[in-house]
Amino acid sequence: MRTEYAARLPVDWRDYVELCKPRVVLLMLLTVIVGMYLAAPGWVSLRLIAFTLLGIGLCAGSAAAINHLVDRHIDSIMARTKKRPVAYGRVSVKQALWFAVIIGLMGLSLLILFVNQLTALLTFVTLIGYAGVYTGYLKRATSQNIVIGGLAGAAPPLLGWTAVTGQLDPQALLLVLIIFTWTPPHFWALAIYRYKEYQDAEIPMLPVTHGIQFTKLNIYLYTVLLLVVSLLPFVVSMSGWIYLLGALVLGIRFLVWAHKLYFTDKPVVAMQTFRFSILYLMLLFVFLLVDHYF
């Protein structure tokens, strides 16, 4: 009854903002900016930055809105997501779909007209990968959903790079590899904390299918791997000592959280690990940017 009543209420503009998952998109756009500046020997045109961020941001918002739409039944079961606009009934399925299509087309148009076709194509593939392949299939099909689907979420720095150069580059793929390796421990920590909700929603996250302790072990192993991968920019002379120091400090700190999580039964530690993983990625890319210019 509550959902039916909510559906009759006027839609607030903030509901549409929420559909775009702004906090997730902002973190993603940070990696886009870093990708752009790392690709440039000097400074990047503010005009190019503006159109790139706006275009990719709109497409990311479109993918997020489709995620809200497809996952509305799952979201209504989970405490963390039950009050999302579509799940709660504040935004109808039709409204969410039209919103996603419109801003997605706007974003792609901006990229084609003012950035370059390669970036537009890669952004479109990323949108389909996240909204279609991951949300529409992988999330419900396999416990490795975020490992496979994480490739779409790891693409933003590559998009920023191609926006500047108009071509693919091995160094840009290294940035993708960092985020790709970061994704499993990030999401699995949340999945441990929200274990019961994922179980009730019948989503085959790793803690649900293989147990919490097995998931903790995988978080530990992936965090070790992430520490190694994060040092590769220095190894290939893509970055210098400032980045190396930052990557080591952040990586060791992340490993401390993974170690603590492995040896405790307190759910709050899983959430603390999840939150630190966000800070880790943000600061790691800031170190990349600072190191590039200093």
Swiss-Prot record:
Claim: Ubl conjugation is one of the keywords in the record: no
TM annotation in the entry: 24-44, 48-68, 96-116, 118-138, 146-166, 172-192, 224-244, 245-265, 268-288
Highest taxon in the source lineage: Bacteria
GO cellular component: plasma membrane
Pfam (any one): UbiA
Keywords: Cell inner membrane, Cell membrane, Heme biosynthesis, Membrane, Transferase, Transmembrane, Transmembrane helix
More about this protein: Carbon 2 of the heme B porphyrin ring is defined according to the Fischer nomenclature.
Protein name, entry field: Protoheme IX farnesyltransferase
Taxonomic source organism: Legionella pneumophila (strain Paris)
